[in-house]
Design a protein with these regions (language model features):
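Beta-propeller domains with acidic blade repeats across secreted/periplasmic ectodomains
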Residues: 35-283
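Bacterial Sec-dependent N-terminal signal peptides
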Residues: 4-35
Length: 283
């Protein structure tokens, strides 16, 4: 019987062709991903004058496309045409206490200093803030590790702030509300939301508006992680429970309820309803 003409006998080139096809299938998704990634994320190198030391703590764009930059040294700089070859730098604010976060809303910048959320407004439109308004403040013990982060705006205009624990050889909360996530309104009302935080430097919303925060490895935190936070949650480090018995605390878990012993977090969560295990662990 004659072989159909459309059937081609396999030869030694089949293995080469198979390997080529496999390689092509591996490359195509990578190429497509690279193309789509570039649509959303692009690295811009901004030239900085030698006379300015930024040590960036926060970034926020104005409605006009200017870039606000808060610095660890206590300043906020405003960059006009930030992606051009020669952006114009103007010192918008100074004299702040280590502002680690910046947001822009309704014509004003908001930043979180070590001890307060501050609203910075340029009333006379000269490019420099002439009003520094304290929205809400909290106590400090003076410990070097009491960093404060934010704010992050909610759709209704309320702000979220996270407060680092102090460090005395281990994480501690010597003053309210260290180790907590706080919600603060524009008129200065504060609501404690969640605790168990150690060094919560980064947080944001997912596509559904749910809040997640990134945690830094350390005591009670075996490895870096991302955790979904809701009101009344306990994220694992017990130091912030020093303030769980305050009248406005959303949870009543006590520090003594968390044994200082070997154990796995998800096992503790079976018996402690407010404990929130991480969504993602980082190696």
């Amino acid at each position: 019987m004659a072989k159909p003409k459309h059937l081609i006998p396999l030869s030694g080139n089949y293995t080469v062709m198979k390997n080529f096809v496999i390689l092509l299938l591996l490359i195509i998704p990578t190429w497509l991903f690279a193309q789509s990634e570039d649509e959303y994320y692009r690295i811009e190198t901004i030239p900085i004058p030698d006379s300015i030391v930024l040590e960036v703590g926060g970034l926020a764009f104005t409605d006009e496309g200017k870039l606000g930059v808060s610095t660890r040294r206590g300043e906020v700089w405003l960059l006009d045409r930030p992606t051009s070859a020669r952006p114009v730098f103007t010192r918008f604010a100074h004299g702040l206490h280590e502002p680690l976060g910046l947001a822009y809303r309704n014509g004003s910048f908001y930043t979180t200093q070590r001890a307060e959320v501050t609203k910075l407004t340029d009333n006379d439109n000269d490019g420099v803030a002439d009003r520094y308004r304290s929205i809400y403040s909290w106590p400090l013990s003076g410990n070097y590790h009491e960093y404060s982060y934010g704010p992050l705006f909610l759709p209704n205009g309320d702000m979220l702030v996270t407060l680092n624990l102090a460090w005395i050889g281990y994480g501690e909360s010597p003053v309210k509300w260290r180790g907590w996530l706080l919600k603060i309104s524009e008129d200065g009302n504060m609501t404690p939301i969640a605790t168990g935080l150690r060094s919560p430097a980064g947080y944001g919303f997912d596509i559904d508006g749910e809040l997640f925060y990134g945690e830094n490895q350390g005591d009670w935190i075996g490895s870096g992680r991302i955790t979904h936070l809701e009101k009344g949650d306990f994220a694992g480090n017990p130091a912030g429970l020093n303030w769980s018995q305050e009248p406005d605390s959303p949870l009543r878990l006590k520090r003594t309820n968390i044994p200082d012993s070997v154990g796995l977090m998800h096992e503790f969560a079976k018996n402690i309803s407010s404990m929130k295990p991480p969504t993602v662990w980082f190696p």
